């Protein structure tokens, strides 16, 4: 349990022990928790820092430990989510609060950080800029792409609601005249509302990855909803800019053209991503320096969630932080 994120209850089957009793014994006598609680534990629920784990490439992300309470966690990419991964874990997501805690790490160590990846949160950006003066800030490509995908799906959903309203109107008209309502059926067997519902997954994929039935459905969808086709092409182009551009110099003009085309399209759902790109232009382009993403932070976040699930929730946050840092810091 010192080295692996497991619950004491998971040992019952293999060692024929009482899991709850062993958990208490581990917490009170075997783990060193009580000594830790009297020292580092005094401020554990506010922050824990591990300056020795700092490295040139860091990630910063937020995670929920218990009851939706958010913590900010800084991790070292080179630890690959294992021992030595956690550099700092801090309660809350306010930029100034995070920076004040990170300043407890000696400046000469913070100056060694060359690059830090993050999502598109302005809070994370401010905290990183205040704390790591020599670091290049990189906006995670997958968060940018997700904004475009969300905008595309928002457009599809709006058309689906329109289709549902239209079908309900026609049903009411048919009922008023004593006739049965026969919905429009396309050549693949989908009704209009089914077409818009069943197209959800194909819009997430590149056209070359569509199955035969998805290709047929996409053609029908795009023939009847050219706005969805335009939005899909914009989303796909953004994906290709990230996938094919090898340098910042190549990506910059492509991204500028893409931004102009988004503005010309005029879709309300794409306004958010246009504004986000404008606000984070430098951080977005910094991806093309080393093609660094925040995937390591997302992966580490998933490990925390899995550990929390094994424990069936976190009733004692301080003890959970003790175990988490014992394993990963």
Protein language model features and the residues they cover:
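RNase H-like nuclease fold core
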Residues: 23-115, 122-127, 134
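A structural signal for short, well-ordered beta-strand segments and their strand-loop junctions
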Residues: 12, 59, 117, 137-139
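Acidic/histidine-rich catalytic cores and adjacent linkers
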Residues: 67-68, 77-83, 108-134, 142, ...
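The DNA-recognition helices of helix-turn-helix-type DNA-binding domains
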Residues: 15-18, 29-33, 40, 120, ...
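Short alpha-helix plus adjacent loop in nuclease-associated cores
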Residues: 141-165
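Short, basic interhelical loop/turn and adjoining N-cap
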Residues: 6-27
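Short, amphipathic alpha-helical "recognition" segments used to contact nucleic acids or chromatin
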Residues: 1-6, 243
């Amino acid at each position: 349990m010192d080295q692996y994120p497991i619950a004491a209850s998971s040992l019952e089957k293999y060692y024929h022990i009482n899991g709850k009793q062993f958990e208490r014994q581990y917490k009170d006598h075997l783990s060193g928790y009580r000594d830790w609680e009297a020292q580092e534990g005094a401020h554990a629920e506010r922050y824990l820092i591990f300056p020795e784990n700092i490295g040139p490439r860091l990630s910063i992300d937020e995670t929920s430990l218990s009851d939706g309470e958010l913590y900010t966690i800084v991790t070292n990419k080179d630890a690959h989510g294992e021992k030595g991964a956690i550099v700092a874990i801090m309660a809350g997501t306010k930029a100034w609060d995070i920076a004040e805690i990170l300043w407890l790490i000696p400046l000469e160590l913070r100056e060694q950080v060359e690059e830090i990846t993050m999502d598109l949160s302005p809070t994370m950006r401010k905290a990183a800029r205040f704390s790591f003066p020599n670091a290049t800030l990189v906006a995670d490509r997958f968060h940018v792409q997700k904004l475009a995908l969300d905008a595309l799906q928002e457009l599809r959903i709006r058309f689906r609601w329109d289709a549902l309203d239209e079908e309900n109107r026609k049903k009411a008209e048919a009922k008023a005249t004593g006739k049965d309502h026969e919905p429009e059926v396309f050549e693949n067997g989908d009704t209009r509302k089914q077409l818009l519902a069943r197209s959800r997954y194909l819009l997430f994929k590149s056209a070359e990855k569509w199955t035969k039935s998805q290709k047929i459905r996409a053609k029908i969808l795009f023939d009847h909803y050219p706005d969805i086709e335009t939005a899909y092409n914009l989303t796909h182009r953004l994906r290709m800019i990230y996938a094919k551009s090898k340098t910042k110099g190549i990506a910059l003009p492509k991204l500028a053209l893409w931004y102009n085309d988004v503005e010309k399209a005029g879709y309300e759902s794409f306004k958010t991503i246009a504004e986000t790109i404008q606000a984070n232009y430098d951080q977005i382009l910094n991806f093309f320096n080393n093609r660094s993403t925040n995937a390591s932070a997302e992966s580490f976040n998933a490990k925390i969630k899995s550990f929390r699930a094994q424990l069936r929730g976190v009733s004692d946050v301080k003890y959970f932080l003790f175990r988490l840092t014992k394993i990963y810091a």
